[in-house]
């Protein structure tokens, strides 16, 4: 599974990138707003930190304007993935963009039918929103499983990018089902390494080592 971080905070991105575990970044208009910086400026800096795909979202809702904005975003860096909404105009833009060799992340997916259309449109990534589906009282992981089955049935190349992740359990379940990518808030990504028994075991090892009076090297 690939790990993307879902943020426009360059300090968080830089810290996580230094671990060698980060495969990409996703942003959206809300995250850009939280950064307090111009979209082109902050996205360019993110692309300089991360070698993998960096999703930058269009804000237009009609095909012509989506394509205009996509052209601007694409010029930021070669690793930009254009993020488009799962609408008919968004799918039309997806088809046009991927046909010209650009990466596209189709976002705001809430059904397997939508995911099927995105794959038909040649999407590089499909972003089903797990947490928001859970908020409706429906198990978001069922959607991931349905998409995985459909994509496997037809050998679609579109990667399932599990989004709206709220917990480490979301990450685990998405990995078990077979999502290709999990885009995770920084706090959740950092929490994946934590376990109380790991901390307890390390504490015991260090205490015993201190009793030996030894040093390595």
UniProtKB/Swiss-Prot annotation:
EC number(s) reported in the record: 2.2.1.2
Pathway the protein takes part in: Carbohydrate degradation; pentose phosphate pathway; D-glyceraldehyde 3-phosphate and beta-D-fructose 6-phosphate from D-ribose 5-phosphate and D-xylulose 5-phosphate (non-oxidative stage): step 2/3
Protein name: Probable transaldolase
Catalytic activity: D-sedoheptulose 7-phosphate + D-glyceraldehyde 3-phosphate = D-erythrose 4-phosphate + beta-D-fructose 6-phosphate
KW Transferase (keyword) present: yes
CDD domains: Transaldolase_FSA
Superkingdom of origin: Bacteria
Record organism: Chelativorans sp. (strain BNC1)
Signal peptide: none
Family, as annotated: Belongs to the transaldolase family. Type 3B subfamily.
